[in-house]
Amino acid sequence: MLGGVALDRLRAFRSEQEAVYAAARPQSAALAAEARDALVNGVPMPWMIDWPIPFPLFIDHAEGASLTDVDGHRYADFCLGDTGAMFGHAAPAVVAAVAAQAQRGFTHMLPTRDAPIVGRLLVEIFGLPAWQIALTATDANRFALRIARAITRRPRILVFNGCYHGTVDETFVELHDGAPRTRPGLLGQFVDLVQGAAVVEFNDLSALAAELASGDIACVIAEPVLTNSAMVLPDPDFHAELRRLTREHGTLLLVDETHTLSSGFGGYTRVHALDPDIWVCGKAIAGGVPAAVCGMTADVAACYRAALAAKPPGHSGIGTTLGGNALTLAALRANLADVLTPANYAAMEARAAPLADALSGIIAAAALPWHIARVGARIEFVLAPAPLRNGTEAAAAHLVELEQALHIGLLNQG
């Protein structure tokens, strides 16, 4: 048995579904074969073949919460580009803004009229008074950690086991049998990341306090909810104690909301009254157009300005040529003003809550040892009987064969 399902039945189901998938998608199969001539493994980016299906699904178009592949199959899209299109594909306001800006140029490495409006909207929605724009949350997190180390003059950061903050090197540490290590799957890693990063379990306040007591932690970088390792919700007192402990030890708190923007208007931070020093969000922040934002308190911004003014000539390690480009700013303005609205959040919540309840009912009726976790409009089924408390429990809940069978079965069901 695996997750309450007999293994022989599971494997037979997956084999049948793979045959159904392949037979129904000749155009995707042909494009996959053609792409293998020039693209590594036939895809532009390795994540596109994370799921072991016969060949990748090639997409023709998407709108709202629907996706249509090149063979004409239409899907109810619950993935939404791994949340990059969290508020729906091709939101009309964003499409119009991008189309209009495209006529005026994509990038100038100079601000446009949209820049001050984007800044004002970010302040109004998310609360922090000073902002910077990047292309991805990986970039924004990397820059934020560099700022934190520069202004605290401390060398290390702290992450939670099972976290995800993009491909920021320092965050790729984990606990293995209770001891920290660099994640073994990293390619080309030449530095022991444990030297620069501490790692503790999510919800483990005692371990957090012990690491912070060392006095050399510049910044704790935290998702409000662990979301890339199943879904792990915080204990009721976790965030208040995290904030208290970081302040007590002179450590900055960076909240990465890239995966929890679904929580409600202003993200998890506004909904649950968190109080970070630095706040980062990417993916869906500009409707799926590459963009990320980094907000900071007035104190952090003042220290950042001073550090920039005092540093020797040369690259600061912060910024990229295309960061804050004209197209990104146009998409950000439209998405912040017209898509990330209280009314749209209310509509998403109104659909998500009954869906989560219905899925929970189906799981219970089938007597499966699974449960549903929800963060606002984001829902996940977790292959464990009860809510998870940390990254180690979340890793154990990844039942790979069952997940793979569910993935292809649901694809074939649309």
Indicate residue ranges for each PLM-predicted region.
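Conserved N-terminal phosphate-binding loop of PLP-dependent enzymes in the Aspartate aminotransferase
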Residues: 1-414
